[in-house]
UniProtKB/Swiss-Prot annotation:
Belongs to the DeoC/FbaB aldolase family. DeoC type 1 subfamily. CDD domains: DeoC. The gene is deoC. PANTHER family: DEOXYRIBOSE-PHOSPHATE ALDOLASE. NCBIfam families: deoC. Catalyzes a reversible aldol reaction between acetaldehyde and D-glyceraldehyde 3-phosphate to generate 2-deoxy-D-ribose 5-phosphate. It comes from the Bacteria. Its EC number is 4.1.2.4. Pathway: Carbohydrate degradation; 2-deoxy-D-ribose 1-phosphate degradation; D-glyceraldehyde 3-phosphate and acetaldehyde from 2-deoxy-alpha-D-ribose 1-phosphate: step 2/2. The active site is at D89 (proton donor/acceptor), K150 (schiff-base intermediate with acetaldehyde), K182 (proton donor/acceptor). Its main location: cytoplasm. GO terms for molecular function: deoxyribose-phosphate aldolase activity. It holds the Pfam family DeoC. This is Deoxyribose-phosphate aldolase.
Length: 220
């Protein structure tokens, strides 16, 4: 299996340097990762670095808490796309989701309308949700018309778990949805990646992508 094309090679640290972002881009090209995932301020720079490659540019919106207004997230999304982003990883407003699911569905629809043919991933921060809430969040993301549901920001108490993915996949299958799953947060080994994919993940977000791919080379 070609694991390389499943990875969003990620660097979202607040203190990430230009040199580190350049290295991220170079690694993504070398290992043919699907995308690099960076904070919005680096999107123009990354666009320059990747202009002769097939590597996509992914950035985050409302990150990492999701506690900005819908208008702010829409504006962030418009700017990110204008500056070169191919994919938007938007953090769901968790407190709003817990209070009013219908309202959040409408928000996601607004973000997808702005994204048009660009990919929209909705981060639901599973560390803050019960299993029942993960099911509800998956339904919300399906109804909102997003392309992916994403487990985690990587900035909460935990990242992705196999159980998270299994719950999401079960809801997706029951509803005959085309929604895809991105697993992220704390993914550091090939074994864990294999388990996540088996459970239903179709994209992996990790800052350890290179180390994981080197594991596959050693395994072969």
């Amino acid at each position: 299996m070609n694991y390389n094309s499943l990875f969003d090679h990620t660097l979202l640290r607040a203190d990430a340097s230009v040199e580190e972002i350049k290295q991220l881009c170079d690694e993504a090209v070398k290992f043919n990762f699907f995308s690099v995932c960076v904070n919005p301020s680096y999107v123009p720079y990354v666009k320059e670095q990747l202009h002769n490659s097939s590597v996509k540019i992914c950035t985050v919106v409302g990150f990492p808490l999701g506690q900005t207004s819908t208008k702010q997230k829409v504006y962030e999304t418009k700017i990110a796309i204008k500056e070169g982003a191919d994919e938007i990883d938007m953090v769901l407003n968790i407190s709003e989701f817990k209070e009013n699911c219908a309202c959040v569905v409408n928000e996601i629809r607004k973000y997808k309308k702005v994204c048009k043919k660009k990919i929209l991933k909705v981060i639901v921060e599973t560390a803050l949700l019960s299993e029942n809430e993960i099911e509800k969040a998956t339904l919300v993301v399906i109804d909102g018309g997003a392309d992916f549901i994403k487990t985690s920001t990587g900035f909460s108490s935990r990242g992705a778990s196999i159980k998270d993915i299994e719950i999401m996949k079960n809801v997706i299958e029951k509803n005959n949805s085309k929604l895809k799953i991105k697993a992220s947060g704390g993914i550091k080994t090939l074994t864990f990646v294999e388990e996540l994919i088996k459970a239903g993940a179709e994209r992996i977000g990790s800052s350890k992508s290179v180390e994981i791919i080197k594991e596959t080379l050693n395994k072969n």
